[in-house]
C-alpha cells in the first residue's frame, strides 16, 4: 500500500522485490551514444502572440518582464552550448517569432559565426508583423530562412477577423503575404488552415486564394 502501483510492477520482470540500484557503466553500450548536441532545435518556449485564435488559446498570451528574461536566458544557453552543431532552427511552434520580444531581438542580433553548421531557419508565424521593415531589421538571418509556415485558418475577411484569427486584420495579412512572396531565399511557403465549425465552408475559397 506504500508503493506506487505503476512503478512497483515492471513490464518485463514482474513485481519489484528488491531495492533500486544503479548499473555500472560496463553494462551499457556507450558506442551508440552520440557525443554531439542536437542538430535541430525547436524554439517553442515563448507563447507570446498578438492573436487569440480559438484553435490555440482563449485569451491573449504575452510574456511579462520576468517571462522575457527567462526566454532570453534560454536563448543565451542555446547560443552558448548548442549553436556549434545546430543545422536547423524552428521558430516557433508556440507563439509568433516576430511578436515575441525575446525571439525578435535574437533574430535582429543573430550572430552567424556561432552557428557554423546552420543551413536553415524555419519560421512558423501568423505573418501579421512580417513586414519589409521587420525583415530588413534582421539581415543576418536572411540567407537561412528558406522555409516557413503561415497560419491563416480562413478564406474571407469576416471569418479571419471575427471568428478564427481574433485580433487579426485581413488587409495586413494580404499585404504581408504579397511581400513574403518576394523573398528570394524562401524555397517553399506552407499556409495552414485548421478546420473548424466556423470555417470549414471556406476550404475551397482558401485554396483558391493561396493559388491566386
Regions found by a protein language model. Give the residues of each.
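C-terminal accessory region of radical SAM enzymes
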Residues: 1-5, 173-176, 182-188
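Leucine-rich repeat
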Residues: 77-82, 107-114, 137-141, 180
Amino acid at each position: 500500500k506504500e508503493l506506487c502501483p505503476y512503478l512497483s510492477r515492471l513490464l518485463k520482470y514482474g513485481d519489484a522485490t528488491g531495492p533500486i540500484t544503479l548499473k555500472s557503466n560496463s553494462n551499457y553500450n556507450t558506442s551508440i551514444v552520440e557525443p554531439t548536441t542536437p542538430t535541430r532545435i525547436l524554439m517553442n518556449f515563448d507563447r507570446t502572440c498578438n492573436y487569440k485564435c480559438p484553435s490555440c488559446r482563449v485569451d491573449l498570451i504575452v510574456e511579462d518582464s520576468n517571462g522575457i528574461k527567462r526566454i532570453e536566458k534560454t536563448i543565451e544557453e542555446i547560443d552558448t552550448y548548442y549553436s556549434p552543431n545546430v543545422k536547423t532552427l524552428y521558430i516557433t511552434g508556440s507563439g509568433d517569432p516576430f511578436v515575441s520580444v525575446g525571439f525578435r531581438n535574437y533574430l535582429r542580433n543573430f550572430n552567424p559565426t556561432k552557428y557554423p553548421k546552420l543551413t536553415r531557419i524555419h519560421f512558423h508565424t501568423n505573418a501579421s508583423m512580417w513586414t519589409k521593415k521587420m525583415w530588413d531589421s534582421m539581415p543576418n538571418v536572411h540567407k537561412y530562412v528558406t522555409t516557413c509556415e503561415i497560419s491563416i485558418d480562413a478564406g474571407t475577411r469576416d471569418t479571419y477577423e471575427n471568428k478564427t484569427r481574433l485580433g487579426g486584420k485581413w488587409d495586413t495579412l494580404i499585404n504581408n503575404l504579397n511581400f513574403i512572396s518576394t523573398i528570394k531565399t524562401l524555397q517553399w511557403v506552407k499556409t495552414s488552415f485548421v478546420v473548424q465549425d466556423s470555417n470549414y465552408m471556406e476550404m475551397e475559397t482558401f485554396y483558391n486564394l493561396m493559388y491566386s
